[in-house]
Amino acid sequence: MNALEITQKLISYPTITPKECGIFEYIKSLFPAFKTLECGENGVKNLFLYRIFNSPKEHAEKEHAKEKHAKENVKPLHFCFAGHIDVVPPGDNWQSDPFKPIIKEGFLYGRGAQDMKGGVGAFLSASLNFNPKTPFLLSILLTSDEEGPGIFGTRLMLEKLKEKNLLPHMAIVAEPTCEKVLGDSIKIGRRGSINGKLILKGVQGHVAYPKKCQNPIDALASVLPLISGVHLDDGDEYFDPSKLVITNLHAGLGANNVTPGSVEITFNARHSLKTTKESLKEYLEKVLKDLPHTLELESSSSPFITTSHSKLTSVLKENILKTCRTTPLLNTKGGTSDARFFSAHGIEVVEFGAINDRIHAIDERVSLKELELLEKVFLGVLEDLSEK
């Protein structure tokens, strides 16, 4: 089966987070020669398929070369394709049923076509057509919870794989990374995310008696330019400057003649490797040192980067250039993704997939040409990694 046929089938399953809807049974049926691991909690399901091609022992026997470098305990390169089969709710006003894929004017329409059943369909097809001549371990990791909290999805499966000594060396997450043409962007990392809540304390009172009040909004005004929109570092070649963004501000009882007793500010900082939760706390405490306050910070994801000169990045770039005739931009833009869980285990990981102009939108679609090219890129990566 090719990428188009597989993607059509995947879209037909209404897998709104965290529903799996039986899609894993279909995927398993495509890979009868692969071993299977499954896990999940709280309604989330995860699937891991893997196969060792030409085990070192078998390969040595075939080549009549039983030297010490071809012993059975020599581990082959383990490469993993990763993704999610869950989708966000489709919403209304689609031109067609979002879970009944249709082809129109060179595009495949359906929820998840770009994010990310198109990418999954492409790497499943590439995996089916892969036939290496040397020892190679190929795996596929899929979850039904990436669009949701992600607590029991890829992160949980990787923990299980660590217990079984099955963590991959390299992985491509098939997120829709491209902006205008297929191949124009590879994510080699992601920014981290820190959420915070700041409460400035005052003394509530009657507006007619200002000497008896301490209005925390006045205090906030004096430090707001040092908090809202401030750059926490200067970034680097791949990361934009880390920035603190206020997301909510609340004070008062709603009465026109009562000053508030406190003002609450919630904020988020998307940050590079140069900024940490500790450095952000140090900065804010310095700014707020003369003001009564409480401060809470929580890191929801850590920043990471895979070097632009890594083997995986180089092989992917070469295949994109060869197949798509495009030189990809290496960047770390966008929100968080499951790639961060791979990086946390020391796995070399990048993200590459379809154009993202209609992700989470009505009439989501992917071009038939994209699916064809994606499949070729992914297969080329497999073939090159197995030969190098």
Swiss-Prot record:
Binding-site list for Zn(2+) 2: 115, 147, 360
Keywords assigned: Amino-acid biosynthesis, Cobalt, Diaminopimelate biosynthesis, Hydrolase, Lysine biosynthesis, Metal-binding, Zinc
Transmembrane domains' residue ranges: none
Cofactor note: Binds 2 Zn(2+) or Co(2+) ions per subunit.
Enzyme class at the top of the EC tree: hydrolase
Binding sites annotated in the UniProt record for Zn(2+) 1: 84, 115, 175
Residue numbers annotated as active site: 86, 146
A GO molecular-function annotation: metal ion binding
EC number(s) stated in the UniProt entry for this protein: 3.5.1.18
Pfam family, any one: Peptidase_M20
Keyword Zinc (UniProt): yes
Xref: CDD domains: M20_DapE_proteobac (cd03891)
Pathway(s) of this molecule: Amino-acid biosynthesis; L-lysine biosynthesis via DAP pathway; LL-2,6-diaminopimelate from (S)-tetrahydrodipicolinate (succinylase route): step 3/3
Cofactor(s) the record lists: Zn(2+); Co(2+)
Gene Ontology biological process terms from the UniProt entry: diaminopimelate biosynthetic process; L-arginine biosynthetic process; lysine biosynthetic process via diaminopimelate
PANTHER family linked to this entry: ACETYLORNITHINE DEACETYLASE, N-ACETYL-L-CITRULLINE DEACETYLASE
Listed NCBIfam families: dapE_proteo, PRK13009.1
Family statement drawn from the similarity comment of this UniProt entry: Belongs to the peptidase M20A family. DapE subfamily.
Subunit: Homodimer.
Job of this protein: Catalyzes the hydrolysis of N-succinyl-L,L-diaminopimelic acid (SDAP), forming succinate and LL-2,6-diaminopimelate (DAP), an intermediate involved in the bacterial biosynthesis of lysine and meso-diaminopimelic acid, an essential component of bacterial cell walls.
Name recorded for this polypeptide: Succinyl-diaminopimelate desuccinylase
Native source organism of the sequence: Helicobacter pylori (strain G27)
